Amino acid sequence: MTQTSTAPEAERLDGIVTLRGSTACRQWNGIQYLGGLSGANAGATRLSMNVATIPPGGVAYAHVHVDFEVMLFILEGRVRHRYGEGLGQSLDNGAGDFIYIEPGVPHEVYNLSETEPVVAVVARSDASEWSNIENYPSERRVRDGAP
């Protein structure tokens, strides 16, 4: 996969935009995102979508989505969401599960496998895709020395 900080180029037709077989990816917060569609390449105004991979044993450090919703569909693997005030609640999800995260809910996501990645389709009600996300304090972030 190709590491990129810009959105991959999409094919624009009359009212339909297609991104074919993207190999571009972006690393963020312990997650690898396969290039998808957003305002940057599709002209979307309220939606973005891509595929996220959490490596074996990996973690998406605690963060909050400010003023936008997120829906996920897990294609492969199992995750644990630590969420809520102080990350005091926990929920496990696996392949075939749909997940909805309300705006403003602090959460940290762990890949439960040390040998297999987690792969999920991620849709956001924010076309900017990478804006409006704030770090949230967590013991794991401090222990790992993550930003």
Task: Give each language-model segment a name.
Residues 63-65, 81, 107:
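Histidine-centered active-site/metal-ligand motif
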Residues 35, 50-66:
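Conserved short histidine dyad/triad with adjacent acidic residue
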Residues 54-55, 83, 93-112, 124-125:
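Conserved metal-binding segment of the jelly-roll/cupin
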Residues 49-52, 71, 100, 115-132:
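A short hydrophobic beta-strand segment most commonly corresponding to one strand
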Residues 42, 67, 86, 114-116:
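Short strand-connecting beta-turns/loops that link adjacent beta-strands
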